[in-house]
Amino acid sequence: MSQQVIIFDTTLRDGEQALQASLSAKEKLQIALALERMGVDVMEVGFPVSSPGDFESVQTIARTIKNSRVCALARCVEKDIDVAAQALKVADAFRIHTFIATSPMHIATKLRSTLDEVIERAVYMVKRARNYTDDVEFSCEDAGRTPVDDLARVVEAAINAGARTINIPDTVGYTMPFEFAGIISGLYERVPNIDKAIISVHTHDDLGIAVGNSLAAVHAGARQVEGAMNGIGERAGNCALEEVIMAIKVRKDIMNVHTNINHHEIWRTSQTVSQICNMPIPANKAIVGSGAFAHSSGIHQDGVLKNRENYEIMTPESIGLNQIQLNLTSRSGRAAVKHRMEEMGYKDTDYNMDHLYDAFLKLADKKGQVFDYDLEALAFINKQQEEPEHFRLDYFSVQSGSSDIATASVKLACGEEIKAEAANGNGPVDAIYQAINRITGYDVELVKYDLNAKGQGKDALGQVDIVVNHHGRRFHGVGLATDIVESSAKAMMHVLNNIWRAAEVEKELQRKAQNKENNKETV
């Protein structure tokens, strides 16, 4: 009977470090809910001590997620562990993940310490975390460059202190698969109490072998794999979880292990992460790239038509990628739209039906026929923008010609007030942005502008993703329409509402802090 490999997702912690703009608490919760649907066993959702915003988002996710174990990261520092526990305590059960460097280089140059002192600190902090939960994970940072005898000493001590999961990270993506498997095997040979903990691995893709290292480690006895959807993460990224999951499924004949992942949710979860994080998936990306199941060679096409298994080791349907259907028009009722969403795997809580149907009718009037990918794009955008808006685009028009100079007129609802402005710009999009900025008074610098087609043909939806810099912080916005200028305007409105909401959250946190201080003074 095969053993289970636990899937530990760190998209919202390690993965987020690769993003140009931080995710809002609402965006993080959307990703967490998608990961829960996919069935990840553990999700690491943040580093609570790093900022009040991260604390709030970890707390929100811990309060909401019920079917996956929620985890937060903490250094081997008392305050880190205490704050992580404070954020997580709203969950029925939770994990604290604490770590310290173990390689000679890190101990000497970063920690300016000794191995004995590192072991003493690790033991103390694991015991401290155990005061809050019996689910404690300990990581040996830079384990890939730690002599295995030193590593064995640290691991044995951490297990004795109460760690139930021991993570062995290849922090800088340096180790070769056969080396990494040797490290795992070496620990099983050297650590007498290793049967009291689950051995986990966390690999990085600096040399392009993160997935290979994780699979080699599983073959050597590791029973938890850490990674991120689409492989996002610091530098070259993390181990791509969808690749590990499907490799274990497809090659169960030699791996002799399994996961409890609902693999039919892989494609949808991948798309959710890509869209929210504003990180397009390369066409040739394994498993979830748009070309992963495409066959252009005549020989291959002929072979696939005769028997798909000639050139396909898995099916698109196995990851939840179904054929595009073409069955909705402006005459389709709410029930038909809802039924199609259900067929694609969406639940009522995944979207607002009123908002979705209104957007569907407007799009159907323009396009005639609405495809599945149109519906999914509309559902995503409406979910992103369903919170109350302080700024709302009421009207815009643009005049431009062969000259570079364009003129835009814009009318916005700002709270209860309607304001209008006009401005010139270097092209229609710049002109609209200049007019919007005049109305709001926000000083924003556009640092990234991406346009992607959602669908096919001349009536395809255009999705605009932008990143702006505002007072040292970066904010992401997304807009969707059949018109590129309208998409661009909607993306800027999304950004401005995100900035406004962030300011409101900051005010609320300051108010709570002030109330706490006032209560202390009263006592």
Curated annotation (Swiss-Prot):
Mn(2+) binds at residues 14, 202, 204, 238. GO terms for biological process: L-leucine biosynthetic process. It catalyses: 3-methyl-2-oxobutanoate + acetyl-CoA + H2O = (2S)-2-isopropylmalate + CoA + H(+). Residues 392-523 are annotated as: Regulatory domain. GO terms for cellular component: cytosol. Keywords: Amino-acid biosynthesis, Branched-chain amino acid biosynthesis, Cytoplasm, Leucine biosynthesis, Manganese, Metal-binding, Transferase. It comes from the Bacteria. Its cofactor is Mn(2+). Pathway: Amino-acid biosynthesis; L-leucine biosynthesis; L-leucine from 3-methyl-2-oxobutanoate: step 1/4. One of its GO terms (molecular function) is manganese ion binding. PROSITE patterns: AIPM_HOMOCIT_SYNTH_1 (PS00815), AIPM_HOMOCIT_SYNTH_2 (PS00816), PYR_CT (PS50991). Its EC number is 2.3.3.13. It is an enzyme of class 2 (transferase). Homodimer. Catalyzes the condensation of the acetyl group of acetyl-CoA with 3-methyl-2-oxobutanoate (2-ketoisovalerate) to form 3-carboxy-3-hydroxy-4-methylpentanoate (2-isopropylmalate). This is 2-isopropylmalate synthase. It comes from Salmonella paratyphi A (strain AKU_12601).
